[in-house]
From Swiss-Prot:
Keywords: Lipid metabolism, NAD, Oxidoreductase, Steroid metabolism. The lineage of its organism: Bacteria, Pseudomonadati, Pseudomonadota, Betaproteobacteria, Burkholderiales. This is 3-beta-hydroxysteroid dehydrogenase. Homotetramer. It comes from Comamonas testosteroni. It holds the Pfam family adh_short_C2. Belongs to the short-chain dehydrogenases/reductases (SDR) family.
Length: 254
């Protein structure tokens, strides 16, 4: 199946690397015009030059409401009315309840959670007349906290709650806007690689249906396929839903 997003306009935050990069490429391949934003301007500009005229890059601090306003205006001025928003940008910082630093916790909330709040607000404002899909990147840790990443877990739990609140609000207001979240266990991105303990190899953590069924990490393109599903009309009956890409971890309580 191709061209599932023909005629659609999408914005992907954190789109210059990792999952965001794979999402940008996949949505373009399915016919959408795709804007992507990132704090890394050099990487973003280089990628935009490679992707062609149906894409555009905007430097974006997702924790800044002023930046959001500028980005939304620039995207719609050049590409047209927004149909799909992927709130993907985020950070991962360690810290348990005894040793975690308040400044790290505040930064996690600002980038992982406040950005989604602002994005949903501005996404709804842009789509309420025409409809669309908002997709928030959460984590399995929103339901199964990681003790060494207490602040990160809390920031993603808030994303889960914000998603449901936004979906309910859109329904009650009569907006044809769907709001859903994706909850991966692990994604093998540069950010994850940097956090792995010494001696832990890609093969040890990566899920493989034949070689490592217990693996808890997935390649970014697998998660991008879930984003495509939620962005397309194939998921038209879904709003306020959570897609768990966790290989049954929640059911096992691990």
């Amino acid at each position: 199946m191709t061209n599932r997003l023909q005629g659609k306009v999408a914005l992907v935050t954190g789109g210059a690397s990792g999952v965001g990069l794979e999402v940008v490429k996949l949505l373009l391949g399915e016919g959408a015009k795709v804007a992507f934003s990132d704090i890394n301007e050099a990487a973003g500009q280089q990628l935009a030059a490679e992707l062609g005229e149906r894409s555009m890059f905007v430097r974006h601090d997702v924790s800044s409401e002023a930046d959001w306003t500028l980005v939304m205006a620039a995207v719609q001025r050049r590409l047209g009315t927004l149909n799909v928003l992927v709130n993907n940008a985020g950070i991962l910082l360690p810290g348990d309840m005894e040793t975690g630093r308040l400044e790290d916790f505040s930064r996690l909330l600002k980038i992982n959670t406040e950005s989604v709040f602002i994005g949903c607000q501005q996404g709804i404002a842009a789509m309420k007349e025409t409809g669309g899909s908002i997709i928030n990147m959460a984590s399995v840790s929103s339901w199964l906290p990681i003790e060494q990443y207490a602040g990160y877990s809390a920031s993603k739990a808030a994303v889960s709650a914000l998603t449901r609140a936004a979906a309910l609000s859109c329904r009650k207001q009569g907006y044809a806007i769907r709001v859903n979240s994706i909850h991966p266990d692990g994604i093998y991105t540069p950010m994850m690689q940097a956090s792995l303990p010494k001696g832990v190899s890609k093969e040890m953590v990566l899920h493989d249906p034949k070689l490592n069924r217990a693996g808890r990490a997935y390649m970014p393109e697998r998660i991008a396929q879930l984003v495509l599903f939620l962005a397309s009309d194939e998921s038209s009956v879904m709003s306020g839903s959570e897609l768990h890409a966790d290989n049954s971890i929640l059911g096992m309580g691990l």
